[in-house]
UniProtKB/Swiss-Prot annotation:
Residues 312-449 form the ZU5 domain. It comes from Xenopus tropicalis (Western clawed frog). This is SH3 domain-binding protein 4. Homodimer or homooligomer. Transmembrane segments: none annotated. Its main location: membrane. The SH3 domain mediates localization to the clathrin-coated pits and vesicles. CDD domains: SH3_SH3BP4. Residues 54-113, 649-719 form the SH3 domain. One of its GO terms (biological process) is regulation of catalytic activity. SMART domains: SH3. GO terms for cellular component: clathrin-coated pit; clathrin-coated vesicle; cytoplasm; nucleus. Possible role in regulating endocytosis of the transferrin receptor at the plasma membrane. Alternatively, may function as a negative regulator of the amino acid-induced TOR signaling by inhibiting the formation of active Rag GTPase complexes. Preferentially binds inactive Rag GTPase complexes and prevents their interaction with the mTORC1 complex inhibiting its relocalization to lysosomes and its activation. Thereby, may indirectly regulate cell growth, proliferation and autophagy.
Amino acid sequence: MAAQKIRSANTNGLPRCKSEGALIDFSGVPDPNLSDVKVLSPSSLRVDNPASLDNVKEVVAIKDYCPNNFTTLKFSKGEHLYVLDTSGGEWWYAHNTTEMGYIPSSYVQPLNYRDSCLSDSGMIDGLLESVDEGVKELDLLGDWTETISQDPIKKCHNNPFLRPSVSNPFLNGPLMPQIHALETGNSVDLLLFDPLAPSHAFSSETSTDVLLDLLPNNTQNEVAVPVKRDNPFFRSKRSYSLSELSVLQAKSENPTTGSFFAGLKSPAPEQFQSREDFRTAWLNHRKLARSCHDLDLLGQNPGWGQTQPVETSIVCRLDSSGGAVQLPDTNISIHVPEKHVASGETQQISLKALLDPPLELNNDKCTTVSPVLEIKLSNMDVQSPLTLELRISVALGGNASALNMVGIKCLRSDAKEGPYNPVTQIYIYGDTVQVKLDNLEPVMYVVMVAQGQGIVSPSSVWEYINKKVTVGLYGPKHIHPSFKAVLAIFGHDCAPKTLLVNEVGQQANNSAPVTLQLWGKQQFVLPKPQDLQLCLFSNMTNYRVDAGDQGKMVRGFQLKLGKVSRLIFPIICQEPAQLSDFTLRVQVRDEVGGVLSQYCVQTPRPPPKTGNKSTGPRRFLKKKEVGKIVLSPLAVTCKYPTFQDRPVTSLKYGKLLKTVVRQSKNPYLLEYKKGDVIGLLSEEKIRLKGQLWNKEWYIGYYQGKLGLVHAKNVLVVGKVKPSFFSGPELTTGLLLEQMLRPCKFLTYIYASVRTLLMENIGSWRCFADALGYGNLPLSYFCRVELESETERVASVLEKLKEECNSEGKEKKSFQKELIMALLKIDCQGLVVRLIQDFVLLTTAVEVASRWRELAEKLARVSKQQMDGYEAPHRDRNGALDSEAMWKPAYDFLLTWSAQIGESYRDVIQELHTGLDKMRSPITKRWKHLTGTLILVNSLDILRAAAFSTQEPEDCII
């Protein structure tokens, strides 16, 4: 905004400084003083000049500044300056009674308004205690005063200037009132800069900010303004939500047609008769702006969180005792020593990771290996330096030439675009760097680079280093029938949790970007800047990824410059009725088609379905009517079927042709005598290794035990049960008990189990009954009353975990009790998902350091790909602890299982086969994977026998 307002036609005809602001026509104002403004000159701006403009603001320098070009103004600490224009954000236009020029805003602070030496500078003579007080004094609320809360607003002790602007219309809204005659001597000027606000707050301001400029004391006329005087909404803030930006765009002179937000219009207060109607409409609009699933159709399917952070940042205030400030979700931190500032003072540190580095830092001789860090300090009166600690994403080549030609350096600058100068006090151990920052400035930019010495073209610094880049997959909070995922490549390991994406469709340049969430990421070594092909695959045929198989290209020069590349992949669900979460596989190929990296990511779940509320009038029961309610005996309070313990009638029978007695006992391989009869659950065969070679096996029931029998040793005779069949009859209860024998030997992650159950179990009462907690009240599981059903399910699960881990009672297996309960309420889909997760995790733990051998047997994974799985889990020295070897093994197994498909039977069968192929296979000592294979192949038999295929007729009311 401008520091002065003059007519669009300058009567003097003199050139104007561009920073003095846009010309605003005040032809409707009768006061002659506003039309006779002269162009600024040094002589006209002296303190003793009575013709000084009313909107000149006095500031004091807090630090010396020596300019490096003729457009900036030199000043010393303690010198008084007079600001003419604050629209430049980080640079203000000011004068010092002798000359004019630009000054950095961080080097000055507004002078206390009560001690201002400008008698007519427009400073507030008596700062009001609250916004409401000023509103009442100026009669700005009109007829809405009774609707606004009388609670006092928090006093603005830090900012001497009140700054009303557009805001949430809920509390108080945008206001540009009509100004009546003010008392002589009372001048009100609400400045539009805040000395404590960050610099980006200024650059994002719009021309619709509310400004109550100083009018002459003798003004008796009203100023016409575009906003109605009786607008009830008023609040002071510096940021805008998507709703407010839509209002500002709609009110602009040249509205953008066909823009990104063309279909997302916020309701205007003038369209409604009462405040309550507008409040309801505004709430409905805000509800729509929460979860975007199609970036091209935001107007039809809106909803991204407009309050998400733009970049990874943190602000922390420390006292003289010191401490540390760590950037969230990164390995970047600043250590503040004790007595860094004097006792009683504080230091506010702002730390931000910038995604795109300056162009000068990436070329043939230099490349960035960390994000550019913006460090802002509030207190320059310090007694000790700061220490910056971060991790770099590069390793020097192993040969001696690489160590001599390339060095890791830390560069620092006072401006984002440079110039950058090296920092001498730097300590490197492994991939961790510590930098000692002295000569502190209010704003500093620090970055780590790999810089070559004596490198001659066509050689580059990339030939002497192993630089790691990160590929991250981003998407909306919930998946929808049509949404877009974004693959982003970063030149370092700091992939932010949220990413701004605006290269979508043919949107306007001024449209706000969309914030997506990080679904998953992986780091890999990029040998050189080259064209990369990024592909995205879905593991479900129901979802189609446009251009996913062919992939999209990232050019080598983009990687060389270190810029963040964002590739957008539209994803469409072929059958929206079957919408569910699924797995996406990310693959990165080099310029010759080789796979550099690939990993799998599980998408979020669809948004929860909300039931349609009845639109008819609600009738509440009277107190005396409650006791008269008689529930129908046909009413069903639980949607889950009842597990019935009854004989399994679908068995087939066979005659054993051979006697088998095993020397090495296996609880899942049967021993039997020739001539006996055995029951077979089905004629489907399982493949696994016997004593010497692979064989085919039936799942049989013999003498009260469930296990495997070699198919060649059985002659199938039919479904008729022979009279001489010995042993107890197979019932669903006995079958369930036999199936679940391997469960207690499987490893699980409780947090993952808890999340799955909370998402998939709809009734805590049915779940508790299945676990054996029949007729126990909710208070038995939780101390406080829980409102949501998911929290109640979680409390029941927590109770089960406590009882299984307690030593006093009979020892129970948490896994076995949980799977048994889920099978009793017919949650087979949830069971197989849990079983598969248990099996993959247990296999990873059992295989541990031998996972590379398993990877070769299952998928023929290259050594480079194996290194990629281990890279994220290595320590600072590049070593991978033996106890952590299960982590890359688990990552690989998740990726591999996603490639197999949706068949849980195939996943466990192929995993068993791969383990059997290993040298000294672990399945010889760890036999419970065989039992798990029996379990998943018996589920259908159990379900068919235990649950009726038809619902009872009285289940429908």
